[in-house]
Amino acid sequence: EISCSLVGSEMCIRDSLKGNVGVIYPTFEEYPNRKETMNIVAYIPQNKDFSYTSEDIRHFFGNKDLEALLIINPDNPSGNLLSKDEVMVLLEWSRERGIRLIIDESFLDFARSGENISLLNNPMLADNPHLVVIKSISKSYGVPGLRLGMAATSDMELINKMRKDVSIWNINSFAEFYMQIYGKYEKDYQKACRDFIAEREHFFRTLQDIDFLRVIPSEANYFLCEVIGRFTSHDLTDILLKEHNILIKDCGTKKAFQGGNYVRIAVRGRADNERLVEAMKRL
């Protein structure tokens, strides 16, 4: 039996796992923030793009005592993507070691060939009870106010643990209605994803024209950029907001950046993307 539970995505980490959890930094910090620091085994890729492969992961965590390994694919904020082959290698490796593999696919719809990489299907889950797939529906469909997310696994013991801590009214009427109708627009959504990927490629090229940014390639709906030269990440974020009413994310305080200057820039529509580029060119 496969069970999908609509829960806060970090609940799988917070309430259901008591041992050590492997986390790759930089990351979506709501996950490690739900655990005691002593229970986080942190891996920071030692390269300028914070990229990694399945081999890197196995090499680092191979001699570590883990109950679970968390993979965000594509990652947040780096946009790093593991291929289907690499994910399958980790799936088998974690099974052999008795490690629960938690994969967050919240941004996978934005990746090229993302549908082919996903492990969110019944046969895959049924064959791998140590696998948990998490997806934040609100991120990919652009409805953050609805607070929709799910965890899917064939491990009923784990699902039952999570369900005990879910509020009896964990989905409001707006979210429930959305879940009833969103399937009608699947073709529109798929087309929007294809259009988005094309726009992301265009935005990547235009951002590279900004002399104080080093843009890191991404398979998500954002770019992690290193701010170099005459600005700090804080200064750039502050100027864009105050002078141009444009908000980007200052990542300088995130773990793994070690005081470096990094920002995360969302990929939006052509007009908004061009407005941001023009604003930065005038700085």
Task: Show the residue positions of the predicted features.
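Short beta-strands and strand-loop turn motifs
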Residues: 42-44, 68-75, 101-105, 217-218
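Conserved PLP-binding catalytic core of the aspartate aminotransferase-like
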Residues: 197, 210-244, 267
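PLP-dependent aminotransferase-like
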Residues: 14-71
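Single conserved hydrophobic/aromatic residue that forms the stacking wall/gate
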Residues: 1-8, 12-13
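Active-site pre-lysine segment of PLP-dependent enzymes
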Residues: 54-64, 77-101, 105-140
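PLP-dependent aminotransferase class I/II
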Residues: 130-216
